[in-house]
């Protein structure tokens, strides 16, 4: 029995799904294969992902492959209630709504696990972590899992290194056709979309501080610069900081950037990127946002401690009054691109979710053959998805001739 906010919203959700599907040709191609082959016949797939239109197309693809789908959200503010209702009408079991309390969030994760799933598809590893801590009775049944995001992979690799991981997990995040496009172009566009549509402020001429220069950070920096911002990067890794500098951005310590920033975007996957000492240095009217998976990159407890009052300044914007200045927090410090917008563009999620679908199939086909480790995506899978995407965009590539292949594998031929 599903539990969603309002089933009458389903027609709107179906429209969103149809729009997304039109722009996800690779996943649709895989759905056709799954419809014919039924690789998941008789299996239950438990999913915890941002429940919006693109995710729904992934779930529908797995449903076409014969799976029973039981799904919840992976963030209290990222579920779109109309899409959740539409998924129920599609025949999925859904436990999710926007604005869940922390208790409700974990209740819904447990509802997914109550279905006794065979395969897990996760974003942030909350579902997998819950299995390992509170629902250990499920470990023997689960064939494996797939993890979508950097934050989740960090957690899972730590578990694997300590010998705590009890079933194999495929690292979807590090697929070339995921992180080079989803993390960079997806996060860049959708984070700026969330900031702009929520604040209705001009970006041009403002100092935009980006915390972190991984693929997500460089995507945000690129798009902010495209809007005319003065982009400032903060980093802890000198190699990435050097890249940012040579890409033309200012690189500062956060304590210096805090003094001059107008808009802040954290993209690190780590906690306390913005904290008390930074809030004290910020100017009146500073806007804070987070594009990392969890809401701990901006220390909200520190911000509350410094504030005389907190109120809603506008939908999805909280005003923290520190007495001598006001600081504005977007989307409760949760993922700004999903809490304040519609998430990544359909075209990049087409590749990310194609990887999820094929990785779930990989787990099924290799049941009992995999160790309890974090596995990288096979190169052949990356290659297939990239080629399908290229063709869908009207592009094509050359092939090496036999002579070229021989040359590249022969150490004898030189100048």
From Swiss-Prot:
Catalysed reactions, semicolon-separated: S-inosyl-L-homocysteine + H2O = L-homocysteine + inosine
EC number(s) from the headed UniProt entry: 3.13.1.9
First-tier enzyme category under EC: hydrolase
GO terms classed as biological process: one-carbon metabolic process; S-adenosylmethionine biosynthetic process; S-adenosylmethionine cycle
HAMAP family assigned: AdoHcyase
Similarity field: Belongs to the adenosylhomocysteinase family.
Protein name: S-inosyl-L-homocysteine hydrolase
Organism whose genome encodes this protein: Methanococcus maripaludis (strain DSM 14266 / JCM 13030 / NBRC 101832 / S2 / LL)
Gene: ahcY
